[in-house]
Amino acid sequence: TKLLLKIKKDNPIAGFENVAFNPRNNLLTVFQDDGLIKVWNIETGKLQYTFIPFEESEYITYTPEGFFTGTEWATKNLVYLVDGLDIIELDQMYDKLYRPDLVAAKLQGKDISAYAKGISLSDIAASGVAPAVNILNKNSTSQSRDIMLDFSVTDKGGGIGSVNITLNGRVIRVSDRSKNSVAQYSWPLSLSRGENTITVSAYNDAEKIESVKSVYKVSWQGKEEKPELYVLAVGINQYRDKSLQLNYAVPDAQAVQKKFSVQNTKLYNAVHIECLFDSDVTKKNISKKFSELSLRIKTDDVFILYVAGHGTVHKDGDYYFIPADFRYKSEDEISLSGVSKTDLTKNLSLINASKSLVILDTCNSGAFISDKGQRGMSEKTAIDRLSRATGHATIVAAGDSQSAMEGYNGHGLFTYVLVEGLNGKADTNKDGFITLTELSNYIDNEVPNLSYEKWGYEQIPQRDLGKQDFPIYAE
């Protein structure tokens, strides 16, 4: 059962119980009889946003353009009814309309119309109906670890765009679009021990609306092998654009490389370290390195991607890593030349490891985003979207140019704390193993404290671990 949100062009005020006016920003809050809370701009007479509270602290906040934020439950259980015709689940439009940063801007009375060009709710609804996906596998158990996943994708009027397969939350395949009205697929999968949850979804041809996910659960009770650890460490000090030069990105990547290579053998059969530094860090070389690693990494293995350099959040709400050969000509150059969320998703989908971690120690250049408050919300939004797109646990430094250039004890602050955590300080239960959650909590506590001591403001790392937690380091 889904709850309905009606989006109409006129947005009339229903009966109300109470109102509140804020003279500082000329916003009128109306508490309606139907439980909705609507906030209006008195100067323009336009609706700013709608807030809907539910039981147990669940909520959704959405703007007239369709941008939304809210709890996971609300996102999965609410649908839009657009102009009385199109019913679309919020979850189907997450990739385009989940924008807590824009909702926050709207809450402050700001105009966000420029961000809605081409991706507003009405534009997305007009792009065509999402296809239907049907997984054909029926067996709930498998005697073999390796299975073939069979499924069909049917065009419902909006065409068939990219197709995504997830295994236990991790994106493992991003396929090309199809011109057939019904497309048949078979894809090999390697299961993990226990129950495996597989989902398949497909976008419409415009890549704006995702289908309802088809879900298949299958159990395999075989024996897993002791994992091997693969680390890809990437760092850029020397950019083609001299204004982007950094001091500690390469030393930081080298420190991570060294730390993981010398750990105890209790956890892994072997440790493999791959590196890309400075001029070697291009979009082409990154993709090539992932392709090479995909031939070696097995399901039971652990994969860690560590990236140090410049990163930014584009106006489309997505994170971009800036490669060494990047030249800043305009904001559009970021989406054209940067390593995008889509690039990262495709690269990470090649990696078979069931346990993985993405660490982005990237600083925001002041040339891209100058408002610190807005930048923090934008970063959180981008990391949420990146982690959902890839299915990989993600931790991001979210530093700025000042801390990146000055450093902390010969390293960037984030990586200094990361290495200190791996040195044993993150091992809260003193069992000799450092888990993903332990390391993340240590970083989350230490980085803000140390940045405040040195620079007078708190650097807040962003993280989205999903439901993953596993030991990544043995002392």
Write out the residue ranges for each language-model feature.
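Short coil/turn segments that connect the beta-strands within blades of beta-propeller domains
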Residues: 24-26
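Cysteine endopeptidase catalytic domains of the caspase/legumain-like
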Residues: 78-475
